[in-house]
Amino acid sequence: MPQPSSATLIRQVFNVLTTIVLCSAVAGVFVSFRFPGTWIRSGEILIAIYDRLFASRKKNDHDPEAVILEKQTSKDTVGCAVGWREEEDIFERCLEALKASDVCAVVVGVDGDTTEDMPMLGVFGDVFPDAPPPIHLDTPVGDALLDAESAIAANIDQLLSIVETQITTQLGIDRSQLCTIDAICIYQPHRNKKAILLTTFLAGIVMARAKQVPFLFSCDSDTVVAPQTIDQVVASLRPRPQAGGASGRISTWKSNQSFLCKLQSLKWWFDQDVSRTQTAATGFLECQPGPSCAFRATALEQVLITWYSASAWGRRCVTNEDRDLTAKLLHAGWEIYYVPHAVVWTDVPTSLAGWFKQQLRWSRGTHFQRLSSHGLYTTMNPYFTMYVMKDMLMPFVACAYLVWFVLTGERFLRLSEYDLAVSLLVELIYTLLTAADRIPWTDLVYLFPSYIFYSLTKPAIHIWSLFTMFNNSWGNPFDRGARPGLTMPEYAWCGGWVYLTLAASLKALSESMNYKKRNAINETFAVVVFPSLLALGAISAWHLALTRPKRRWTEQVGSVV
C-alpha cells in the first residue's frame, strides 16, 4: 500500500523556490510582454500537446501482462450512483447506463427519506425489477462517525460492519449471500452529498469485498455513462498498483438546449483538454469530478474517514467533496489518472441563476480544499503548484486591474483587447485541429462568446465564493420547480461586477478615439458616467433583491450544514 505523501525538507524548499521562480516568470510575462494572455495560453496548449504525444504514451507503456489486464470487462467493478430528488427521466437514464455497462453490481444512494424522495426509489425498482427492496438507514453513517469520531476514527472496518449489518439484516440474508445481489439501493435522512457519498462508498466496498473485486466507479444521478467508459477508466488502474483513482471526460448532454448550455459545453471541452491534461503531464490531478471517477477499493478504505471528518478553522465543508477526496488520495501517496477518451454526459443548468449557484458551490469547495490542504502543495511538482497559485490569484489581479484602469486609465498589466482577440484565435485554431471529430462545426461559433462569458464572470464568482466559503449545500436542483433565487448580497455583487466591466469597456473604447475626444470622454466619465454607473448598479441590485422570489435557495435545496 502506498505511503503518505512526504518529501524531505530540502525537497520541499526546492519545490517552494522553484514555484516562486515559475510564478515570477508568469508575472513577468504579464508585465513585460506585449500579448501576455496569448503567450500564457499558447504555453498551456503546448504542454497539453506534449502530454498527449509523449507523456501519456510513456505512462501507457505497460508490460504484456498489463495489456491483458486492460482487456478485462467491467465485471471487476462495482458501479455507484448518488443523488437527491433527481428528475425521474434523468435518473432512469443514469441507472440504465450503469446497468448496460456490465458492472458486477450497482449501488445507489439517495439522500432523503421523505415523500418527495420516493420517486427515485421507484425508478430504481423499475430499472432493477429483480433487486431487493431499498434499504433505509434511520441515521446516516456519517452522523455516527462524527458523533463517535474518537472511538472509530482509526477503524474503517467498523464502519463497513455497520453498513453490512444493515444490509444483511434488512434483506434477511446471510453475509455469504451478498455476492448474489446485483443491485441495491440505500436511502437515508437528507444531509448533503458528502454524507450520502460516504454511505454509498461504504456499501460499494462491502459489495466489492463480497464479490472479490478491486474497483469502484462512481457517478452522479444526472450522469449518463457511455457503454465502454467504466472499463476504459478502470483500465488505467488495473496494471498500476500505485494508482488509486482515475476519471474520464465530462460532456454536457443538454448542449443543444439553450445558449448557456452551448457556452458550458465549449468551456468544459477546452478546460478538460488543456487545463486538466497539462496538470496530468506533471503526474497530478487536482480533482476527480463526481460525474466520472473510479477508485481502487483499498485506496478508498484508507482515506474515507479522514476525508469525511476533515475540518479546518473549526468548520466542515461539504461542497466540492470530489476535489477534497482527490487531495486525500494524493496525500496518501496514490496516483490519479485522467482518461480523456472515456466519456460521460451530465446535466447542466439551463438558467443563469442555476449556473451561478453551481459555480459558487464548486468554487467555494475549491477554496476550502486548497487553503486547508496548503501543506500538500509543497510536496507536489512545482509546475502543478504554480498552476494552482495562478488559478487562485489571477481573478484578484483581474479585479484590481479593472478597478485601477477605470479609476486612472492606466494599465499595470499589458493586457488589451487585441491580446484577448489573439488569445481567442489561438484557442480557436487548437480547437479546430483537435476537436473536429468531437465537436460539431456549427458549435464552434459559440467559442468566442464562451471565452468572453467565462473570462468576465470567473473573477466575480471566484472572489465572491472566497468570502462565502462556508455556505454549503447540494447546489441543485438547477431548473426544477421555482426559479432559484439569489440573495441580496449576491445580486449586489453581480450588479456591481457587471457595471465595473461595462465601465472598463467604455474606458477602453475611449482610448481608441483621437486625443481631444478621448480627453472629453475621460472627463465626462470621471465626473458623470462612473458615479452614475455605481449608483445605477446599487439601485438595480436593491431592486432585484426586493423583487426576487421569497423562497430562499437553501430552502429549495435542503438544509445547510
What does each of the following model-derived ranges do?
Residues 369, 373, 470, 474-480:
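Juxtamembrane amphipathic/hinge helix adjacent to a transmembrane helix
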Residues 1-10, 461-462, 475-484, 556-561:
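Short, low-complexity, Lys/Arg-enriched N-terminal segments of secretory-pathway carbohydrate enzymes
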Residues 30-41, 388-473, 490-561:
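Membrane-embedded multi-pass helical conduit in multi-pass membrane proteins
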Residues 63-385, 389-393, 560:
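Non-transmembrane catalytic domains and loops of membrane-associated enzymes and transporters
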Residues 1-11, 21-27, 383-386, 483-490, ...:
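Juxtamembrane membrane-interface segments at transmembrane-helix boundaries in membrane proteins
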Residues 6-10, 378-394, 479-503:
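Loop-to-transmembrane boundary segments
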Residues 2-96:
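N-proximal low-complexity "stem/linker" segments adjacent to membrane-targeting elements
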